[in-house]
Amino acid sequence: AVNEINQQAVYSAEVLSYDKGWFSTTAEIKLAVDFQALINAQNVDSTDIPMEENPSITATLVAHHGPVYFGDGLGLGRVHYMVSIDGDELREYVQWDGQQPIYRNEGVVGLFGGLSYADVIPALSATAEEEGFTLLFSGYAGEAEPDGDKTLYTSSGESLSISADEFSLEMKNLSMDMSYDGDMVAAFKGDLFESTGKARIESIEISNIEPGATVKIENLAFATDVKIDEDNNTANVYVEYAVDKAVGPELDATDMVLGVAINNLDIDFIKAYQEFSNNSLLVPSEEVPAKMMEFIEANLLTQLKAEPEINITKLKATLPEGAFNAYANTKLVGIDALPGTLEDAAYWVTHLLADAQITADKALAQSMASGYMMGQLMATPQAQNMTAEELQAAVEQQTPMMLRTFAQQGLIKETEKGYETKLTLKDGEASVNGTPIPLPFAPQ
């Protein structure tokens, strides 16, 4: 693990002590982030970021070897371990129970390779009186158990609050559930492996972003799902954000969901990009564009041949005026060579396969059209001499006419509940609701 960390551009691990016996091993490892190298590579004046040395922490590892291990108790397994980070160098900035480390992870690697562990971060607080800043964190506890070839992990924290002179933020009931195939070292390296996860925050309240204004969010959720196709050496990644309710100044929405699927990611391309990204951290900023072009020329075609997809599988919300629902699918197909220039829009359109649909309740569509019409009117010289009532009357008169015109042109289609629009793109030709539309950059 130490070697893997040292292969990362800005991280380092140093074994400070190592003592291996018949039944146990104890080690101290110093973990550091090389901010100085980052600063030097990006030509940042180091006086702007005063730092005597790179920030670091020391982790202590105690492992009791199996198959029968003796530690705090007796058990069966390949190894029983405990990793702790005292974090004493952080106590100048953050306060917590003096008898506890800032992080503790204790677990067992079973006889057949399954991993179970529990980890804890204690309650924390931080105060900067001059800046009027306060942070309070209730602490965090997690547990992992093996489930066949996977590891199941659940964790929770009661609350997190941050307050400053300008604003305050309070989160309650934080939790995370994960199921994964890989290990911690693989995750640190950025390797892709099959996993599912969901993080939740039951309530969020943000105050004083604007004077006297408060934003409240209920049940914010973030979900991920990674699938690996070993036969084709590709991965599919799905990410979803969801909010049950959000209320604030000029904001009142429920049942909000955004789901994005990125499919047919070539794993060799991902590994090459991670290596490039890692190495580029220490490359002077003026050299990065040229290095990026070298990477693209050497690796992009591999990804394009896998026919990647970026799909918005879900986009929906309910507003006071009504609800809308949308999706959009895009896929690059039939590419066996890069274009002469990546800015060749006609080339990409030829190889782009897309379809999209949006539906909206009638009242919501009318409200959106009214807003658009108001913007158009306000941009005209005549609007300068009109009262607010006259502007609103003009909008109410012209909005139905605009919607009818769009419907006659085939840009929208009226349904029983509202309006819908369908867009397709194939072989460089686009259509809206079945009506062909010209593209300014279509191939000739």
Each model region followed by its residue ranges:
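Glycine-rich, small/hydroxylated-residue low-complexity segments
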Residues: V2-Q444
